[in-house]
Regions:
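Conserved DEDDh/DEDDy metal-dependent 3′-5′ exonuclease domain
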Residues: 77-198
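C-terminal or late-domain output modules
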Residues: 64, 71-94, 258-284, 288
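Ser/Thr-centric signal marking residues that sit
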Residues: 11-14, 185, 246
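Acidic, Mg2+-coordinating catalytic module of metal-dependent nucleases/exonucleases
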Residues: 113-120, 124-125, 202-284, 291
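Short, surface-exposed amphipathic charged segments that create phosphate/polyanion-binding patches used
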Residues: 74-76, 193-205, 218-219
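Charged, low-complexity interaction regions
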Residues: 296-307
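Conserved non-catalytic scaffold segment of RNase H-like nuclease domains
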Residues: 2-7, 11-133
């Protein structure tokens, strides 16, 4: 039987340099950053099904990391000294984007699947949008492209964004006219590894819930803490380090059987609502109530969603 290989990738991203002049608050900046991510750090491993690593790659993107107007839009921009230390020690290499993509393409060809935790972001947004940016950057139409992006950002902050990708949930990574099957590790973990009572109890005991309190956290960090029993583990949020822990998560999932191409938009929903779980496990109800109240304390509206949360609190208080 042919040995299978898996490429596990992670990216760290900034966004377009004019985002800050268009966004009126942090949420609008976040919305632009999610819609228009520019990769500045990319790393990947190639491993077998046991998690043995065959190859590792890690690069800083010259056109984004070394351009302050771009890198300063990154959520983790304070990590610049850490990156420069890594660069000085030759622990990470800086290359132009096109050179990195040539290496990535060759490694994708040598793998049976390309994988990422939240693959929809890395393979459907971050890499494709960076491709468009770099292509425009080295063209004679860059200013026209930037003007279109500025108008698009204005639409995003005004709550309207018609940039649709009909192939967003097709488990295929398209890169320079080549196609590679995707396995979304977030969805895989939610299906095979963390949708169980032990994990949900772990989340409730430690307050590991989503911001609204309605769902259990299911990030790579939280999943790895539970699966590796490394409960104090903190995700690095640098590309190769994160790809390494995601390689271990994949190996755990492969112990439960072979994988098939898959991608998910909201895999955390696999675990169900926290309030449904605490109906059967009422000792945790106060954890959920407190989290929802904390979320509501930051809101000042009378929306349907707010009223829904208030009704959930009322329901939980009667248990």
């Amino acid at each position: 039987m042919k040995r299978k290989y898996y490429l596990i990738l992670d990216t760290e991203t900034a966004t377009v340099p004019f985002a800050g002049t268009i966004a009126r608050n942090e949420q609008e900046k976040k919305n632009i950053a999610i819609a228009k991510p520019l990769v500045y750090d990319i790393g990947w491993t190639i491993s077998d099904r046991q998690g043995s690593i065959i190859k590792k790659e890690n690069y800083l993107v010259q056109e984004t990391f070394f351009v302050p107007q771009v890198f300063n839009t990154a959520y983790y921009r304070d990590k610049r000294p850490q990156y420069m230390e890594m660069f000085g020690k030759r622990e990470i290499e800086a290359l132009p984007w096109n050179n990195i993509i040539e290496i990535l393409l060759q490694d994708c060809r040598n793998a049976d699947f390309v994988c990422a935790y939240n693959a929809a972001f890395d393979f459907k947004k971050a890499i494709p949008f960076t491709e468009k940016y770099i292509k425009a950057l080295y063209s004679n139409y860059y200013q026209k492209w930037e003007n279109r992006q500025i108008e698009s950002c204005k639409q995003i902050v005004n709550g309207y964004n018609n940039a649709k990708n009909e192939k967003y949930l097709e488990p295929i990574f398209e890169l320079r006219n080549e196609e590679f099957p995707i396995v979304d590790l977030w969805g895989l973990a939610c299906q095979r590894l963390i949708n169980n009572k032990r994990y949900k109890d772990y989340c409730l005991k430690n307050g590991l819930l989503t911001q609204s309190g309605l769902y259990f956290k299911s990030s790579a960090e939280t999943s790895f803490q539970y699966l590796a029993k490394e409960y104090n583990f903190i995700e690095s949020h640098t590309a190769l380090d994160d790809a390494l822990i995601e390689t271990k998560i994949l190996a755990k999932a492969l112990q439960k059987g072979k994988v098939f191409p898959m991608i998910s938009a909201f895999p955390f929903r696999e675990l169900g609502y926290t309030y449904d779980y605490v109906r059967e496990n009422p000792k945790y109800k106060q954890v959920v109530i407190d989290k929802i109240n904390s979320y509501l304390s930051e809101k000042n509206d009378n929306s349907k969603y707010t009223n829904r949360l208030l009704n959930i609190i009322s329901m939980l208080e009667t248990i």
